[in-house]
Design a protein with these regions (language model features):
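Junction motif at the cytosolic side of a transmembrane helix
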Residues: 2-39, 86, 167, 254-256, ...
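Hydrophobic alpha-helical transmembrane segments of multi-pass membrane transport proteins
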Residues: 85, 96-168
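Alpha-helical transmembrane segments and their short interhelical loops
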Residues: 139-140, 144-211, 259-266, 270, ...
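Hydrophobic alpha-helical transmembrane segments of multi-pass membrane transport/permease proteins
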Residues: 66-92, 97-112, 213-219, 271
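Membrane-interfacial helix-loop-helix junctions in multi-pass membrane proteins
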Residues: 222-277
Length: 290
């Protein structure tokens, strides 16, 4: 190959000369790229409380309708059976009012306290809280939505139990409308207590045990007439959130109900409900970060 052809090949393969200004700008651009690191994309704003609460409530209510309807029948049948048994030893008066009111609120305790304690205990044991923790919703909306769904789910069973009890003991049905206030207030108090028990229990079995014990306390302290209880049991009865719902409902069976006392009982029940739901929200935050 001649020297002329060799020089032509080298000229083709050789890179084009870079101008001095471009060569000086290249390091500057590289340095600038290192100085200006890519910024992370901004996160989406968190969901507002009330829309999140409504979404959790609808989801939990639809789940309860599918999975909890048989248990609602069990709770209603259990309360009706207790009233039938008590009919043989209680004739009427204040004792009959206590039996009917306590059996009706027992349906709320069975679902809102017992089942909700088991539900949150299962969520914590199975890692289900991690799913809720990844959602952009406030922790309070998760607890309040589940509690409201379980409490409102008990209204049909409570109403059926109250109607059957009025027929068994010959009590007036004119005050059954008070259940529209008793069920949500007592349900909120019991659901908050059940959620707190389920979230604070270190094991799922202990959450189930706590829910069962709470329901048994609501049964023994709510259905039995307080006049026949020792003073120590009466004091323990006053510590149970459902007691004030039972008292408010029982007062409506009187010939002339003391509506001021009914309002006071409902107010205490609502205050206990706010406190128990606040404790349940704190327990949810505590369990979600562990």
């Amino acid at each position: 190959m001649s020297d002329r052809s060799t020089g032509a090949v080298r000229a083709v393969l050789a890179p084009e000369p870079v101008p001095s200004s471009a060569a000086a700008a290249a390091p500057a651009e590289a340095a600038g790229g290192r100085a200006q690191a890519p910024q992370p994309a901004p996160l989406a704003p968190g969901a507002r409380f009330f829309p999140s609460l409504a979404a959790v409530y609808r989801a939990q209510l639809s789940r309860a309708r599918v999975a909890r309807i048989p248990l609602l029948f069990v709770a209603t049948f259990q309360s009706v059976g207790i009233m039938i048994l008590m009919r043989g030893v209680v004739d009427g008066g204040s004792e009959a009012r206590a039996v009917v009111a306590g059996s009706s609120v027992l349906v709320v305790a069975f679902v809102a306290l017992n089942l909700l304690a088991q539900y949150f205990g299962q969520l914590r044991a199975g890692g289900g809280l991690d799913h809720y923790a990844t959602l952009p919703v406030p922790p309070a909306s998760v607890v309040l939505g589940a509690a409201a769904a379980y409490a409102s789910f008990t209204l049909p069973g409570t109403l059926v139990t109250a109607v059957v009890g009025c027929l068994l003991f010959g009590l007036p049905m004119s005050g059954l409308w008070i259940l529209a206030a008793v069920v949500p207030l007592a349900g909120a108090a019991l659901a908050g207590l059940g959620a707190a028990l389920g979230l604070l229990a270190p094991r799922q079995e202990l959450a189930t045990l706590a829910g069962q014990l709470g329901m048994s306390a609501a049964l023994l302290l709510g259905v039995l007439p307080p006049e026949r209880m020792p003073d120590v049991i009466v004091w323990a009865r006053d510590l149970l959130p459902s007691t004030y719902g039972v008292e408010a409902f029982a007062r409506t069976f009187a010939p002339r109900p003391d509506w001021a006392a009914v309002a006071l009982d409902l107010g205490v029940c609502g205050a206990v409900g706010v406190l128990s739901l606040a404790v349940a929200t704190w327990a949810y935050r505590r369990a979600a970060v562990r």
